[in-house]
């Protein structure tokens, strides 16, 4: 009986894992996003100056590493002491990529800026998360307080930030990278423990 049950348990766990890889949840509230993740790391871009930067640009957010890339280069935007990350060309996207540390959650404040790097109100931004599957979300009328976050059941490959083709530049501020809340793995670990119990019983 237990011998025949073990393959069924393994199959159920594998099916659950396969199904979870396609699940990306969108958050538009930072507090809700942070409640769904663990060990967040932040990058506020305040070390950037208003100038052109080569692409890709290596960055860190807490213990996590990542790159920001754009075809025509990146641009440090912002005013005063509050600096942001943008692109050199308005139609170019920012691609956040090559995450380290098992990053499966990515969020931040996303809005539009002008040719001088100043804030443009009510821009429309399009963000796409890719973890093997893709999910696209449009921020309409984005402001400096427009938060968007993706939480995946799998590690993220890329997150892309672009405009809808308007005469403004895609801009990011205060991005946060994280891993899943430990409870995300609870059912899987419990299932694996059950497989271990089945194995021990079969050999006893």
Predicted regions and their residues:
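N-terminal signal peptide c-region/cleavage motif recognized by signal peptidases
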Residues: 17-19
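Surface-exposed, well-ordered secondary-structure segments
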Residues: 23-178
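Absolute protein N-terminus
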Residues: 1, 22-23
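A short, hydrophobic C-terminal helix/tail in secreted or cell-surface proteins
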Residues: 181-199
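Bacterial N-terminal signal peptides that target proteins for export
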Residues: 1-8
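Short, charged juxtamembrane terminal tails flanking transmembrane helices
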Residues: 201-204
């Amino acid at each position: 009986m237990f011998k025949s049950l073990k393959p069924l348990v393994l199959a159920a766990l594998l099916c659950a894992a396969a199904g979870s890889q396609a699940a990306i949840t969108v958050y538009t509230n930072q507090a809700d996003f942070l409640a769904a993740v663990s060990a967040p790391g932040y990058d506020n871009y305040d070390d950037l100056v208003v100038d052109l930067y080569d692409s890709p640009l290596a960055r860190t957010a807490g213990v996590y590493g990542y790159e920001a890339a754009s075809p025509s280069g990146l641009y440090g935007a912002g005013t005063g002491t509050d600096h942001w990350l943008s692109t050199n060309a308005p139609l170019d996207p920012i691609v956040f990529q090559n995450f380290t540390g098992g990053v499966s959650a990515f969020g931040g404040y996303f809005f539009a800026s002008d040719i001088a790097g100043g804030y443009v109100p009510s821009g429309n931004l399009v963000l796409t998360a890719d973890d093997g599957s893709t999910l696209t979300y449009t921020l309409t009328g984005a402001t400096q307080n427009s938060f968007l976050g993706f939480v995946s059941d799998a590690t993220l490959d890329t997150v892309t930030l672009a405009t809808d083709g308007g005469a403004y530049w895609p801009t990011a501020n205060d991005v946060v990278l994280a891993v899943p809340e430990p409870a995300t793995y609870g059912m899987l670990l419990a299932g694996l423990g059950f497989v271990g119990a089945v194995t021990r019983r079969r050999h006893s």
